């Protein structure tokens, strides 16, 4: 059985199907991924449309999307609904609100950055998929534990930075545009890219183990979260580079 330390893609959920259930497929998982990205696009378009007439409301939507998406993500992970499609769709729309506002703000400061970050994200996805396909990096249990631990460390760093900001403080170099700040962004992108290997591996294992079809949503959910992370880190890196 394929083992995973990823809290979104728990290994026992992908262990196999019971008699009579539809089973997980690659095409089904791709369809779920496309569905979630359509929800993200819808949320982003709503924020962009609102920003044209009411910038203040667009900023509110961005905040609601960011906070609400984070809470919804935690609810989904810890409640483990048997049919998670609706909740994951809501999560994706909330993330769309946030990403739409985030992209507008960054685009106003750095024209063209959205396209650059989008292309960068696609390139990272493509490269990591090829690395996975040719088994240059294999998602072994030790690899997955290491990458998931690194991801958790990044999350704690950002969470600490968020709380410190209320006291007018911050983590040194995290948001700086100097060499150290750029290196930090590169490391974070590297960790996010390695998480794609984990996502690919768990999805493939779910298909091979004939996991229930509902697991397609979980595979799509994990991959979507990782791609959102890659995009945000790519925007941060490009903004730092363009500040120099």
Where in the sequence are the language-model features?
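A hydrophobic alpha-helical transmembrane-helix feature that marks the membrane cores
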Residues: 1-244
